[in-house]
């Protein structure tokens, strides 16, 4: 079960809010007090809420769902990209395009264009004219900045994790419209309404942003590792069951077919047959005795030649 600690939050400066004159009254229950005109966030309330968010992220990952990391402001951009890539999740760190989730069909067209340009770049743009190659390179770079983090998504994400719900208000609005769960860092100057998993904390400090993203990424990685271990255990148990003597799950390839067993036993029990040359060298009495072993009926009136014909 993913958990963080009060010590980590203090070290990251999570408790520092905005100036008291810019506060949102709806955040009042999360504010401890004021120091030098700056609101101080009550970490005793942040801690259980953040742990709830971490557990939710773990559960979502364990069932194979995706979490979209969103942080487009300068302080968050590089951190969001780094941590999302580390845990194998999609991200948006440059600019939120309108309709990125609510109009995903159109966005998929742009993603396809980006992949086509990347393929052409691998083949070498030099096959095109200098001006055309330059224009294609610029287009690819522009699309990469906006869509590079979601180009491997096959559908809209299942959850979004937002660093600053004020800056990312368009992303939050689209998630609400699609009824997607939102994990959001909410500072003292914003309202927590509409955020499913509120994490009251500093959303401006690079250290604090790095802490949030790192903890969420760690929870995701732990869930993936636990799921992978569980699958490996199930596979190993199945292998042991197939090797167990008398088990009904014995691999089919190890059990000979019924017809093959019958044929083998017939071949082993049936005496070897002789050719005509060998039969001609035998006396009639020996031929009759041999015929009995072969299950061939010989009449007393049969000549040696007729007997050989029946046995051959």
From Swiss-Prot:
A GO molecular-function descriptor = structural constituent of ribosome
Supply the InterPro entries for this chain. Answer: Ribosomal_uS2, Ribosomal_uS2_bac/mit/plastid, Ribosomal_uS2_CS, Ribosomal_uS2_flav_dom_sf
Q: Which domain of life is it from?
A: Bacteria
What GO CC terms are in its UniProt record? Answer: cytosolic small ribosomal subunit
- What does the record list as coiled-coil region(s)? none
Q: In the UniProt record, does the keyword Ribosomal protein occur?
A: yes
Which cysteines link up through disulfide bonds?
none
Gene Ontology biological process terms from the UniProt entry: translation
- Is Heme included in the keywords of this UniProt record? no
Q: Which family does it belong to?
A: Belongs to the universal ribosomal protein uS2 family.
Q: Which HAMAP family match?
A: Ribosomal_uS2_B
Matching entries from PANTHER family are given as: 30S RIBOSOMAL PROTEIN S2 PROKARYOTIC AND ORGANELLAR, SMALL RIBOSOMAL SUBUNIT PROTEIN US2M
Protein known as: Small ribosomal subunit protein uS2
The organism of origin for this protein: Ruthia magnifica subsp. Calyptogena magnifica
| Gene that this polypeptide is encoded by | rpsB
């Amino acid at each position: 079960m993913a958990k963080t600690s009060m010590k980590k939050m203090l070290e990251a400066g999570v408790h520092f809010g905005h100036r008291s004159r810019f506060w949102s009254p709806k955040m009042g229950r999360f504010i401890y007090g004021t120091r030098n005109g700056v609101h101080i966030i009550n970490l005793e309330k942040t801690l259980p809420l953040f742990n709830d968010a971490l557990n939710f992220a773990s559960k979502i990952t364990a069932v194979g769902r995706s979490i979209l990391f969103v942080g487009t402001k300068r302080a968050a951009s590089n951190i969001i990209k780094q941590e999302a890539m580390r845990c194998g999740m999609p991200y948006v760190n440059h600019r939120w395009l309108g309709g990125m989730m609510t109009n995903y069909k159109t966005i998929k067209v742009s993603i396809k264009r980006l992949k086509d340009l990347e393929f052409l770049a691998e083949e070498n743009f030099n096959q095109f004219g200098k001006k055309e190659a330059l224009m294609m390179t610029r287009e690819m770079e522009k699309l990469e900045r906006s869509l590079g983090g979601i180009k491997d998504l096959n559908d809209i994400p299942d959850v979004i994790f937002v660093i600053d719900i004020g800056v990312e208000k368009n992303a939050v609005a689209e998630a609400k419209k699609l009824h997607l769960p939102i994990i959001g860092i909410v500072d003292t100057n914003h309202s927590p309404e509409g955020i499913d998993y509120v994490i009251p904390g500093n959303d401006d400090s690079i250290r604090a942003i790095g802490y949030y993203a790192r903890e969420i990424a760690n929870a995701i990685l732990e869930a993936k590792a636990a799921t992978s271990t569980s699958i490996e255990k199930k596979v190993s148990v199945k292998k042991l069951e197939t090797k167990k003597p008398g088990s009904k799950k014995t691999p089919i390839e190890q059990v000979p077919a019924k017809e093959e067993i019958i044929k083998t036993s017939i071949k082993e029990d049936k005496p070897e047959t002789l050719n005509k040359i060998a039969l001609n060298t035998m006396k009639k009495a020996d031929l009759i005795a041999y015929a009995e072993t072969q299950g061939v009926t010989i009449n007393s009136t049969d000549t040696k030649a007729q007997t050989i014909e029946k046995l051959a």
